[in-house]
Swiss-Prot record:
Belongs to the CT45 family. This is Cancer/testis antigen family 45 member A5. Residues 1-23 have a biased composition (Basic and acidic residues). Testis specific. Expressed in cancer cell lines. It comes from Homo sapiens (Human). GO terms for cellular component: nucleus.
Length: 189
């Protein structure tokens, strides 16, 4: 008996697995491990996230030089959750509350500065959501009709959109919904 254990300990290649065992963990276990990795990788504070985004910008060469980056990161290290500034080595507060200098106008300007979506992008997004909603089991067509009203463009584009959704509904065996869509299409034309 000791010969077999010594042989297994020395040469693990001779050990065979059972037919159902595999090297990789199960799908559910991989999902749990990925979720844990995301939680650990995300960090617990916004400070870490902002510092990491600055490092990414630095790596791509679009933003801040290293000397300024270090000073900006050092500025973030002294804040606690309640807004009091602290010395890096101690937990004693140094000054008063820190306030933000952003106004509502700044946020509006940033939102308008971002690139607006084109009609095609909006319509493609609506179509993707519609197909997803069609495939769901249930008779809640109000949400689908609301999304169809959001389609942008001339009537020819809307007509093509309706026709493609009718085909998808027919493919998903939604006969009653196809009837409703055809009625709406006739009213639109």
């Amino acid at each position: 008996m000791t010969d077999k254990t010594e042989k297994v300990a020395v040469d693990p290649e001779t050990v065979f697995k059972r037919p159902r065992e595999c090297d990789s963990p199960s799908y559910q276990k991989r999902q749990r491990m990925a979720l844990l990795a995301r939680k650990q990788g995300a960090g617990d504070s916004l400070i870490a996230g902002s510092a990491m985004s600055k490092e990414k910008k630095l790596m791509t060469g679009h933003a801040i030089p290293p000397s300024q980056l270090d000073s900006q990161i050092d500025d973030f290290t002294g804040f606690s959750k309640d807004g009091m500034m602290q010395k890096p080595g101690s937990n004693a507060p140094v000054g008063g509350n820190v306030t933000s200098s952003f106004s509502g106008d700044d946020l509006e300007c940033r939102e308008t500065a971002s690139s607006p979506k084109s009609q095609r992008e909006i319509n493609a997004d609506i179509k993707r959501k519609l197909v997803k909603e069609l495939r769901c089991v249930g008779q809640k067509y109000e949400k689908i009709f609301e999304m169809l009203e959001g389609v942008q463009g001339p009537t020819a584009v809307r007509k093509r959109f309706f026709e493609s959704i009718i085909k998808e509904a027919a493919r998903c065996m939604r006969r009653d919904f196809v009837k409703h869509l055809k009625k709406k299409l006739k009213r639109m034309i």
